[in-house]
Design a protein with these regions (language model features):
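Sec/Tat signal peptide C-region and signal peptidase I cleavage site
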Residues: 16-20
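N-terminal intrinsically disordered, low-complexity segments enriched in P/E/S/T
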Residues: 21-167
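Bacterial N-terminal signal peptides
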Residues: 5-15
Length: 167
């Protein structure tokens, strides 16, 4: 019996580092060249940096994961999802209030925002797809959300923005 326990523990010692290593591998920088913007009932648009550059840049001050204040710049999510058909402004009423945005990352991480959280008619909160911090380029696009106590929705390596309607 003791031999079985020792054998089982020794296997765990070899398995755990592999799992941690796999997790670390998934966090390595990737070169993301476009973001897919998809709106249920609308269309799917592929946006590259040149497409985003046509939008109005927004700068916001926010504290990063370590609590250090920085100046982030990028593009408001509402400006990115609107061309694909997301309902905002005067059209964000009735059943459209149930729209939500799923942010997807290269490593499989997901976060969700209500579309009302992105609309200035509903909130003063600002959520951007950031590409710079203190004037220096970020490795990949990242979600930056003001006034968040936790940074669980600060998705890194963003690959897709998908607007859905809760039914």
């Amino acid at each position: 019996m003791k031999l079985l326990v020792v054998f089982s523990l020794s296997i765990l010692l070899f398995v755990v580092p592999t799992s941690a290593q796999e997790k670390h591998e998934a966090m390595k920088p990737v070169n993301i060249t476009e973001i897919s913007v998809e709106v249920e009932g609308g269309k799917t648009v592929k946006m590259k940096a040149a497409d985003l550059a046509k939008l109005t840049r927004k700068e916001i001050k926010a504290k990063d994961h370590d609590g250090v204040e920085a100046l982030f710049s990028g593009y408001e999510l509402r400006d990115i999802i609107a061309p694909a058909g997301a309902k905002l402004g005067k059209d964000l009423k009735g059943p459209m209030i149930a729209q939500y945005l799923v942010v997807e990352a290269a490593d499989g991480y997901h976060a969700v925002f209500s579309v009302t959280e992105l609309d200035p008619d509903f909130t003063d909160k600002v959520v951007i797809l950031g590409d710079k911090r203190d004037g220096k380029p970020l490795e990949n696009w990242q979600i930056i959300a003001t006034n968040e106590k936790k940074h669980a929705r600060w998705v890194r390596q963003v690959t897709a923005l998908k607007v859905r309607l809760a039914h």
